[in-house]
Amino acid sequence: MRILGIDPGTMVVGYGVIEAADDELSLIGFSSLTPPASAPIPQRLAYIYKGLVEVIELYQPDEVAVESPFADKNIKSALAIGKAQAVALLAAANHSLSVTEYSPACIKSRVSGSGTASKEQIQEMVRLLLNLAEIPQPNDAADALAVAICHHSHRAFANITSQGD
């Protein structure tokens, strides 16, 4: 199964694609989309949408996983991220792809075993789980790979628990 993970944002959108075959994970590709910082939000969202459509058409994922915005103290930031998240959902839906959303705490827990893991710990786990020499850069792409790994872990656990029925 090929999984596209997306770390949404209006300044940078990270994406990462993994292939999951049994318990083996392999890296297919990763990068980020960086719309012009001076562009108004609608133009940045259009740039993100077009870029994600190109990513979907290039990598042909089976499923998409997207990080949900975290609204703690900065509601304005969470709302902006939510707009980028909606664009990611739309790009996937327009390609008839199944999309699952995950909270930051769920991603941390699935990737590292701790919902309170640091960004550095998550990035190191991504490196280890994908058997890479270095942590993927930019950070947004490493975060997107963590989203994809989380989705694989979630699906694997769901398959195990459903076999007992």
From Swiss-Prot:
Please list the GO biological process terms of this entry.
DNA recombination; DNA repair
**One MF term in the entry's GO annotations:** DNA binding
Instruction: Quickly give the catalysed reaction.
Output: Endonucleolytic cleavage at a junction such as a reciprocal single-stranded crossover between two homologous DNA duplexes (Holliday junction)
This protein's record includes keyword Plastid: no
Q: Where does Mg(2+) 1 bind?
A: 7, 140
Q: Which residues bind Mg(2+) 2?
A: 67
The cofactor named in the record is:
Mg(2+)
Give the Enzyme Commission number.
Answer: 3.1.21.10
Q: What keywords sit in the KW lines?
A: Cytoplasm, DNA damage, DNA recombination, DNA repair, DNA-binding, Endonuclease, Hydrolase, Magnesium, Metal-binding, Nuclease
Q: What family is reported?
A: Belongs to the RuvC family.
**Which PANTHER family does UniProt cross-reference here?**
CROSSOVER JUNCTION ENDODEOXYRIBONUCLEASE RUVC
NCBIfam families assigned to the protein according to its UniProt record, in alphabetical order: PRK00039.2-1, ruvC
Name recorded for this polypeptide: Crossover junction endodeoxyribonuclease RuvC
The species this protein was found in: Dehalococcoides mccartyi (strain ATCC BAA-2266 / KCTC 15142 / 195) (Dehalococcoides ethenogenes (strain 195))
Q: Which gene encodes it?
A: ruvC
